Amino acid sequence: MDILRTLASEQLKKDVPEFSNGDTVKVHVKIKEGSRERIQIFEGIVIKRQGGGIAETFTVRRIASGVGVERTFPVHSPRVEKVEVTRRGQVRRAKLYYLRDRVGKAAFKIKEKRR
């Protein structure tokens, strides 16, 4: 059992910033196309974080061409280059699934956290 824990702790990233639900983030993801590798930025609102340790994931939602797009990323994945927090949001829920029902500007209406 300790062997699994030590292997998992070696795989954990050290440079993961503090972010939570309601925050607007930019996720820099490595995309491999044939032999080329490039970085794609996915910007949106974090609607959930779940799991712990090596299996921790977070889901980011954004509106692209009038359609809601959600992507789930493992926090400690080598494909996730970095996560930038652009805006801190203040929410009262752990899971922001109610944003799925909102349309237009209301889909992004989240109070900004006071400093």
From Swiss-Prot:
A GO molecular function assigned to this protein is:
structural constituent of ribosome
Q: Which UniProt keywords apply?
A: Ribonucleoprotein, Ribosomal protein
Output the InterPro entries linked to this UniProt entry.
Answer: Ribosomal_bL19 (IPR001857), Ribosomal_bL19_CS (IPR018257), Ribosomal_bL19_sf (IPR038657), Translation_prot_SH3-like_sf (IPR008991)
User: What cellular-component terms does GO give this entry?
Assistant: cytosolic large ribosomal subunit
Report the superkingdom from the record.
Bacteria
Pfam families from the UniProt entry:
Ribosomal_L19
Alphabetical GO biological process terms: translation
Name the family the entry cites.
Belongs to the bacterial ribosomal protein bL19 family.
* Protein purpose: This protein is located at the 30S-50S ribosomal subunit interface and may play a role in the structure and function of the aminoacyl-tRNA binding site.
Name the NCBIfam families on file.
Answer: rplS_bact (TIGR01024)
Which protein, by its recorded name, is this?
Answer: Large ribosomal subunit protein bL19
Q: Which organism is it from?
A: Alkaliphilus oremlandii (strain OhILAs) (Clostridium oremlandii (strain OhILAs))
Per the record, the gene is rplS
